[in-house]
Amino acid sequence: MLEAFLSVQIIVISASKAIYKKNDKSRVKMNRLFHAAAFASSMMIVAAPAQARITQLEILRTEPAFGGESFGNTGTYERVFARAHGELDPGASGNKIIQDIELAPRNGRGMVEYTTDVAILRPADVAKSNDILLFDVPNRGSKRAMLLFNADMRGSPAAFNNFEVAGDGFLQRQGTTLIAFAWQGDVAPGDNRMMVQLPTAINTDGSPVTGVVRSELTTLSPTVSLNLSAGWFTSTPPHTSYKSVETNNTKVLADGFRPTLTVRSRANAPRQEIPVNDWSFGDCNTPSETQICLPAGFQPGKLYELIYRAKEPTVMGIGFAIARDVGAFFQQTEHDDTGVPNPVVHGPKVKSIITGSSQSGRFIRSMIALGFNRSEEGHRVYDGAMPHIGGGLMPLNIRFAQPGRAWGQQVDHDYPAYDFPFTYGRETDPITGRSQGLLDRCNDNNTCPLIFHMATALELWEGRQSLGLTDPLGLRDAPEPENVRTFIMASTQHAPPSLPLPANPPFGLCQVQSNPNPHTWTMRAAFINLVGWVRDETTPPASIKPSVADGTLVPADRVSFPLIPATNYGGVTRPALRYTGAVNSLQVLDFGPGFRPEDSSGILTNEPPKSGVGSYGLLVPQVDADGIDVGGVRDVYLGAPIGTYTGWNAFRPEFFDGGFCNFQGSFLPFAATKKERIVAGDPRPSLEERYPTKEAYVSAVSKVADSLVEARMLLPEDRERLIKEAQEKGVRAGP
């Protein structure tokens, strides 16, 4: 039996390598052959247990979803809430890369155990399934896929996480089965967030593992006490904190280490140390291993940085193995070890797509790069991947990892999130001298998924996304692998704000209103295209992205942004938004000899990291006369605009000296009339100049919508909706 398994593997791998460079359809067919052969061969050796697997699926409850609402031909849905219990062989080749897995406690079989929440939305009638399993990687414990693809999603985070809101039911009308799983070990409970139980690393002599932790602390209102994990992106939702080894912050440890607390006004400002006697570990009443007290008060708009010795790190890298093993279980396994049947449609004809937004998109890229899209049986786990607004990497596989951290120009600026390699294909980094690509490991064993990389303009402005499109110095466009498509959504921000926008200043923490240009319509079209590629072997549209070659991706000092004055259009007072040509600079960061930047893995000992001399070449979108991005997917809102939409905004001056306003774009409306814009000194044509009649506006919307449908970047049903809105409402009064 084993010989037959090996023969199948060798034959298929040899054949696949011979034709892998051929056209998309040949490559996709061979990948399918390899996947089917691996699946079949894995069934031949069921007597040999996998070295990493889900051993028990504990079903907590199964019930009708969405109040019994029916969705087109699919009918009704059910929601299933469960816990998956898994185990890992720390000595297996696919698990050895996990940081500290050798220090994790083991069960009687020598395995490392974990338990993860699982949530499923499935057609009540399995025959109505579209044979697509969509795996949702939660963002800081919260489900995101429904919010990405279903329109009209209104409700609370708790309701979204409990699968109570379906919006317009887009995914359900398709017959898609949705599976979400927890992976992040430091998310605090609440709002029905998904939780995971991961082991704590322990030294072989039973003593606690310790190490240095750097925690950037911020607050939106004055306070005297914070949790040690209270960063910009780790306070809401809350994250647990690594414990300090000592609550007396004035005590010098045996090796000479003493914790420090500093403050600065912006990321590149000098750190000013706060005297050790002016702060303490605790809530200002009681000493605590997980809190900090500053009697003088933590202030908004400042970056506080605590560097302390922590203990008991969670083995966070197991999160990648969870993604691998949960995906493999639901696609290929008939039942768990206790006889509980697989609750979703599965088998060789069923295809899987993994998607995640922002933090979760970086998780997907890192999971693939570290080799976790290969199951223990040797086959590809996820057939397709759709990382959304996640251009960097996820520093999860690190001792004392802080996966809730991000990569802002001001906030979380120098946490590990952007280590070379940046591109899916191989590039050579002239700064580090390494040659590498994110798909190296999966290319070696033919387990790469078909990838739709989705990003916004903000990812280019603040998220360093251009490094995924060019060589490391930004001098030329990088070749794109055949299994990858990239779609940059022009003039969009990281995630659209809730509407209506604030009518009067202050506009949140930003200088002007945020950018409401939605992702939904482009994301829906992309999803259908990816499903067609994965399931039906339909060649997808070519990538749509700005480029160096055509002049739509340029250095920031070459952007021709218009001079837009302060205005009072519609009775809303808006200041002039000054274009500064700023970018979110990036140098090689040295976190110490225990950190492996090629894998974004290891142990951080240099905190803060030492910054290298050479800088990577960051590029941004060129714009038209209205300040709207020229390259990328220009949706209906940009083809028939009512204002300028950008991928950047600025903080109010009292926050971080006016640097990039975290993950926010800008909306600057046009004047209603020619007279109004001339009085304001606005160079952009007014609404009446662009659309002298309602019919002219409807015609403009229809023309853009038709071109997007032809390009397969807008679904026909969404074209009808957008044109109907234009016909009913005329020129949009707001974003």
Regions found by a protein language model. Give the residues of each.
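C-terminal His-loop and adjacent cap/lid subdomain of alpha/beta-hydrolase
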Residues: 53-735
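Sec/Tat signal peptide C-region and signal peptidase I cleavage site
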Residues: 48-52
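Bacterial N-terminal signal peptides that target proteins for export
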Residues: 25-37
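Bacterial N-terminal signal peptides
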Residues: 37-45
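Short, low-complexity, charge-dense intrinsically disordered segments
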Residues: 11-14
